[in-house]
Amino acid sequence: MQNLQPFHTFHIQSNAREIIEAHSIEQLQQVWANSKSENLPVLFLGQGSNVLFLDDFNGVVVLNRLMGITHEQDANFHYLHVNGGENWHKLVEWSINNGIYGLENLALIPGCAGSAPIQNIGAYGVEFKDVCDYVDVLNLNTNETFRLDTEQCEFGYRESTFKHRYQQGYVITAVGLKLKKDWQPILKYGSLVDFDPKTITAKQIFDEVCHIRQSKLPDPNETGNAGSFFKNPVVSSEHFEEIKKHHKNLPHFPQADGSVKLAAGWLIDQCNLKGFQIGGAAVHKKQALVLINKSGATGQDVVKLAHHVRQTVAEKFGVYLQPEVRFISATGEVNSEQIIT
């Protein structure tokens, strides 16, 4: 068995039968074929920034290390073709330094480009789908590569077809991004609303987003975590009004379909759970949405803590939180919501 601890940001002690870095599509195909012939499960990881290992993984972990960025442009748009192993934050930095704007709100999101479409990553008013042109996918059972446009990706809130139809036996090899040359700042959330849209630069947004994230989110290199552990729940307008009767300052974000998105971190905070600990796992003291590996936590410690948080919030608000983090058992991904229910 090989130690997985350095390859995922929760840094929970767990092992895999084998860990392989794949630097080419041919290597991905070879590892898949070998693993299938030995009847071993395969897990593809980028930087392991959104996974929780519940047990040792009884198979092969393949680290996506497909690298490279190409840039083309026309009169109106910049087009980036980004291979799946590229670090997401470094890509954002690279784009700003090259005068290509539109990714700045997504600064400091951990992980790599190939993982971004799976979760439809988002922050500060921008989601991956807003900048996505296409996603290139390798079907490992046929060795064919195909391209999905944005609509075919079926993006939703922390949701995409890559969690369903294209989950097993597929790997994202590259993403295509389409960024307007006529750049418009997105200043909808947090301290960004205080900026003047007429004078703000993309670099200033980038710096502010980095500052906000660094001030309230723990650095995974120092404190194991997987970022936001829970999704922000979406409730009906009736349910929202009911909660608001008792909590006048409830942060909320009306959605196009009439539903209302609530801030999961605020709900957890109202339950006085910051700092709450089970085993080696704890709710972060600064940002309640983040569960941390405080001291030698096991996967089960985190599961028990997540269950306690979910139950406590449900009892107070009638809202059941869903994990954003993917749970990995000995044989592969499992339903995270079922595990913590």
From Swiss-Prot:
Origin superkingdom: Bacteria
Annotated protein name in UniProt: UDP-N-acetylenolpyruvoylglucosamine reductase
Main location: cytoplasm
Pfam families linked to this entry: FAD_binding_4 (PF01565), MurB_C (PF02873)
Active-site residues, as the UniProt record annotates them: 158, 228, 324
Gene name per UniProt: murB
Positions of the FAD-binding PCMH-type domain: 12-182
This enzyme's EC code(s): 1.3.1.98
GO molecular function, one term: UDP-N-acetylmuramate dehydrogenase activity
Keyword Oxidoreductase: yes
Keywords: Cell cycle, Cell division, Cell shape, Cell wall biogenesis/degradation, Cytoplasm, FAD, Flavoprotein, NADP, Oxidoreductase, Peptidoglycan synthesis
Location(s) in or outside the cell: Cytoplasm
Function per UniProt: Cell wall formation.
Catalytic activity: UDP-N-acetyl-alpha-D-muramate + NADP(+) = UDP-N-acetyl-3-O-(1-carboxyvinyl)-alpha-D-glucosamine + NADPH + H(+)
GO biological process: cell division; cell wall organization; peptidoglycan biosynthetic process; regulation of cell shape
